[in-house]
């Protein structure tokens, strides 16, 4: 089976010259097979450790040398682009956030139809299979998502006499009262992934959307969008501080853990880190993790919908080890391995497989009880349109957050902001038309 | 230009009558094979690792290339599309404001700092070393500390201002578009100032003392000496430093990427960050390359003109 | 003997005005240092005084760095790459600067300008085509990739700086040496270089700083954890999605700045005098 790949050959040749100085790696030994995997630093570090353990275990069983490389998620884009450009790099790669990579790198990803059909039945089937197929094919496996519940300070809610707020309007009311006593509501509205998630959730909850099912028609210009925008304007001016315009993905976590925010729309990572760092409520000895609870993502007049980062995994088709890589994916997607992996991640990394959403970890802590519920209403960010490179670009350019923020801050009227977003989106979608 | 310098030297040598004949000296500067052999390594390095990728980038900007594909020729279509995009026009404006403001700040403050450093006697090394530090700490990490200092919730800057009762509310350094631009300019200045100060200091050291003494005996005060001796003699250094810094400031990526990601409302996007979003995140290399190269023709012209001027100035010293 | 008035005056006209500059330069670095020494519970408590450490100094962040990550390997990698790239660039720079400063040959002027123009090429763009080249050379995932690519942005600067420096050295001594039978290379090494030491040190220091700080190429061309450079390693491992390990990041920045700070402490005077001659001419 062992083949000397061109890459290995070149490396050996180059290594000969380099060998004396032993800079970098020793010349690769051509006889051993090596499988490499590029992944992102997980938000819960134990997840990476468990993945590494499984990867090595599989490697030992199959006599394959394995290497798991971890990078910060912000750097993944650069790395993917460089590997595709060079047609060389890792065998397996994390993809995302979002399924857009499958469209963007369609020609460079190996088909995973066989793996996807193999692993589904053992795990109770995919949550929403049609969402993950890109141009009718499995180009990646959706891997994990961090569902976005509402993280809330129960002690403050009690003080305000509020009981289980459920709609976005409820949260506006709570936030308004909270802000009056120095505990505003917090949701990012700047250039960050969280801003995309929450503002899209609000847009859908009010019945709006930005692209039609056909993946072509821009549907942002609607009365539902206007309603959503007016709501966000009120939320911004009455219930939040202007700082949300500059928030990155980490800011709302800090706002909650510092004891300032009454509630944030965020995965459980804030709670997890508060628990680990033993952060206390300012001015008391009480641990803040004890007064945090997570409840359902809010409902709007039209719907209850949310989205999140869809993290995926794929295999480059220029890899010399496509079959080996598939074999590892099958191994990792075995129920017992996925179970251990979800356990290690405290449920933060929820797979897109039905059985895993019922993982015992979600019953282990009262905090997690709504996570599976949120997952049920979670849709891809381009909903109801398909995931495409264009929808990914709408996400990457933060068109949705900017549209909302420009209206909320009074920089533009609702109509101006919508017209602006509509034009940008039309340009993006038009520029993305595939040549016949 | 080279020629003139050489002739000048030959004339000098001949006049002093201590050098070999002009013919031999002329022979000594004509050694083409050696010249090429010496330049060879640099030439091939730049050819393969800069020129080739650069030509490819030029091609990208004129094609509909995506990541991994060479694409086909589309002329100036990418540039035309950029000019239709509101975000790009905003980026263009931001880049000009950012570069102009940061350069002005760095030049003025750098000059003041260089003049001060020049006169130091005690703690000279210590203070020179201290002001040089921002330039040498890894940018990828030092930008993070700035972000931590301006981060809305924990901002030490706001904490200080509030504690001193200068303001009684949190200043929205990063949420407000104009303050955000101010902040990224400030951080760029922090990082670039040492380069200006130290290089200008080097220029000051090189100015002969006698010129100041002569100006003083002509009755020039400190300000007069500054304008009539220091500034004219520093001009060549200033020109090069500003040119260098203009190029690097215009290509700045890290500060904006860490502090604002181009927000709020794209009001701080620069060429590099916008090109990153278009070219890498969205995979439209053609578009991204067009953003990066948008100012290239103008810069090229500026470099040519300025280099010519600098050389002339250096020649007539 | 100077009068007290003369001794005090510089205090107001010189040392007082220079203070704001020093503060501006140092405060962020001071903040970096104390952040790296604070306990998390104090770091994330909004009610504390941000620039003091009240609840005790901790070395926990440094421990995290050296025990839970491969920090010291990254540190050594950075050192190897920076030193190697610096040596390569300075040597190539010296070789290229010499004929540009001393010889007349067809294409000399154009090459001088071309060297400067390379700076106009934005690195954020160049790295994609460059990654193809690096891969074809078989250098991906080895430190060689960086030793080979860093000179692309170091050589132009070194050449430019040394070119200026060489021009300030009188050429008579070289001419004498050549009449005595030395060849070009011998003249360059034995006669010119010893006089040009400040210029060479200045170029080397600059090259070392730029290599040490480089991020993009190091990220793109090298993946294995044990081969990462310091900045890439620290950022990869200590920024985890929406959680930043502030203490650890700042500890990395502090330790990571040390080698350059030490280099500058030793060579600061050379740096200034090297620039004096090199950049000015």
Regions found by a protein language model. Give the residues of each.
Chain B
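Transmembrane alpha-helical segments of polytopic membrane transport and secretion proteins
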Residues: 1-39, 122-124, 307-317
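A structural signal for multi-pass alpha-helical bundles of membrane permease subunits
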Residues: 34-317
């Amino acid at each position: 089976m062992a083949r000397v790949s061109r890459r290995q050959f070149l490396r050996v040749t180059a290594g000969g010259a380099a060998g004396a100085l032993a800079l970098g790696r020793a010349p690769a030994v051509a006889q051993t097979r090596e499988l490499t995997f590029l992944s992102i630093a997980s938000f819960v570090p134990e997840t990476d450790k468990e993945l590494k353990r499984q990867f090595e275990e599989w490697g030992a069983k199959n006599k394959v040398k394995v290497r798991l490389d971890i990078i910060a998620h912000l750097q993944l884009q650069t790395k993917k682009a460089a590997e595709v450009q060079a047609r060389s790099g890792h065998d397996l790669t994390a993809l995302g956030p979002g399924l857009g990579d499958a469209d963007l790198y369609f020609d460079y990803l190996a088909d995973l139809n066989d793996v996807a059909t193999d692993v589904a039945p053992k795990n109770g089937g995919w949550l929403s299979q049609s969402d993950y197929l890109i141009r009718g094919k499995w180009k990646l496996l959706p891997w994990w998502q961090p569902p976005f519940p509402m993280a809330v300070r129960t002690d403050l809610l009690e003080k305000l006499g509020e009981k289980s707020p459920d709609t976005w309007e409820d949260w506006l009311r709570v936030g308004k009262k909270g802000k009056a006593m120095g505990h505003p509501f917090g949701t990012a509205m700047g250039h960050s992934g969280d801003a995309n998630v929450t503002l899209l959730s609000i847009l859908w909850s009010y019945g709006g959307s930005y692209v039609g099912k056909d993946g072509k028609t821009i549907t942002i210009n609607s009365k539902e969008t206007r309603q959503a925008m007016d709501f966000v304007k009120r939320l911004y001016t009455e219930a939040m501080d202007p700082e949300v315009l500059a928030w990155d993905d980490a800011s709302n976590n800090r706002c909650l853990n510092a004891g300032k925010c009454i509630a944030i729309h965020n995965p459980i990572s804030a709670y997890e880190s508060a628990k680990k760092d033993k952060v206390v409520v300012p001015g008391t000895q009480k641990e803040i993790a004890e007064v945090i609870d997570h409840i359902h993502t809010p409902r709007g007049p039209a719907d209850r919908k949310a989205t999140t980062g869809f993290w995926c995994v794929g295999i480059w088709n220029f890899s010399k080890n496509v079959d080996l890589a598939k074999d590892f994916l099958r191994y990792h997607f075995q129920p017992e391995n996925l179970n251990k992996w979800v356990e290690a991640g405290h449920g933060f990394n929820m797979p897109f497989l039905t059985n895993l959403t019922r993982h015992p970890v979600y019953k282990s802590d009262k905090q997690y009880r709504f996570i599976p519920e949120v997952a049920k209403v979670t849709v891809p960010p381009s909903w109801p349109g398909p995931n495409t490179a264009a929808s990914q670009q709408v996400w990457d350019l933060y068109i949705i957050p900017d549209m909302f923020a420009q209206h909320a801050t009074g920089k533009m009227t609702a109509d101006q902001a919508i017209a602006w977003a509509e034009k940008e989106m039309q340009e993006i979608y038009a520029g993305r038309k595939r040549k016949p | 230009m080279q020629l003139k310098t050489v002739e000048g030297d030959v004339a000098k040598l001949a006049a002093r009558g201590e050098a070999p004949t002009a013919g031999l000296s002329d022979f000594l500067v004509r050694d083409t094979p050696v010249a090429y052999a010496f330049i060879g390594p640099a030439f091939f390095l730049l050819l393969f690792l800069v020129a080739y990728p650069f030509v490819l980038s030029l091609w990208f900007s004129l094609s509909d290339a995506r990541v991994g594909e060479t694409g086909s020729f589309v002329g100036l279509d990418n540039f035309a599309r950029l000019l239709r995009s509101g975000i790009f026009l905003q980026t263009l404006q931001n880049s000009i404001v950012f570069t102009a403001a940061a350069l002005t700040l760095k030049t003025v403050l750098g000059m003041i700092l260089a003049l001060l450093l020049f006169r130091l006697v005690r703690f000279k090394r210590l203070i020179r070393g201290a002001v040089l530090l921002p330039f040498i700490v890894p940018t990828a990490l030092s930008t993070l500390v700035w972000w931590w200092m301006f981060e809305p919730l924990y901002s030490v800057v706001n904490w200080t201002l509030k504690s001193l009762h200068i303001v009684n509310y949190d200043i929205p350094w990063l949420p407000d578009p104009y303050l955000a631009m101010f902040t990224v300019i400030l951080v760029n200045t922090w990082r670039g100032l040492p380069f200006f100060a130290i290089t200008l200091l080097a220029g000051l050291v090189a100015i002969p003392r006698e010129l100041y003494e002569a100006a003083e005996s002509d009755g020039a005060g400190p300000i007069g000496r500054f304008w009539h001796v220091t500034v004219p003699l520093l001009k060549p250094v200033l020109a090069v430093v500003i040119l260098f810094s203009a190029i690097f400031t215009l290509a700045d990526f890290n500060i904006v990427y860490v502090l604002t990601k181009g927000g709020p409302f794209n009001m701080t996007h620069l060429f590099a960050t916008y090109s990153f979003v278009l070219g890498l995140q969205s995979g439209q290399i053609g578009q991204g390359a067009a953003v990066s190269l948008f100012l290239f023709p103008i810069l090229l012209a500026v470099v040519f003109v300025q280099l010519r001027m600098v050389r002339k100035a250096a020649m007539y010293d | 003997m100077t009068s007290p008035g003369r001794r005090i005056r510089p205090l107001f006209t010189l040392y007082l005005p220079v203070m704001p500059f020093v503060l501006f330069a140092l405060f962020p670095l001071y903040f970096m240092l104390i952040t790296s020494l604070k306990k998390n519970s104090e770091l994330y408590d909004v009610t504390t005084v941000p620039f003091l450490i009240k609840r005790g100094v901790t070395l926990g962040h440094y421990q995290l760095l050296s025990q839970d990550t491969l920090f010291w390997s990254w540190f050594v990698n950075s050192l190897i790459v920076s030193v190697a790239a610096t040596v390569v660039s300075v040597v190539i720079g010296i070789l290229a600067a010499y004929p540009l400063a001393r010889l007349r040959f067809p294409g000399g002027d154009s090459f001088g300008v071309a060297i400067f123009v390379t700076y106009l090429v934005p690195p954020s763009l160049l790295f994609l085509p460059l990654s193809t080249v690096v891969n074809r050379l078989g250098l991906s995932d080895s430190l060689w990739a960086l030793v080979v690519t860093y000179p692309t942005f170091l050589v132009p600067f070194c050449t430019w700086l040394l070119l200026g420096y060489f021009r300030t050295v009188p050429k008579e001594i070289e001419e004498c040496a050549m009449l005595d039978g030395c060849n070009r290379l011998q003249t360059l090494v034995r006669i010119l270089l010893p006089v040009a030491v400040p210029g060479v040190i200045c170029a080397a220091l600059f090259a070392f700083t730029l290599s040490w700080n480089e991020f993009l190429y190091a990220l793109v061309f090298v993946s294995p954890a044990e081969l990462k450079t310091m900045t890439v390693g620290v950022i990869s491992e200590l920024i985890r999605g929406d959680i930043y390990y502030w203490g650890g990041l700042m500890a990395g920045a502090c330790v990571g700045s040390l080698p350059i700070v030490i280099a500058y402490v030793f060579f600061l005077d050379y740096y200034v005098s090297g620039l004096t001659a090199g950049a000015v001419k």
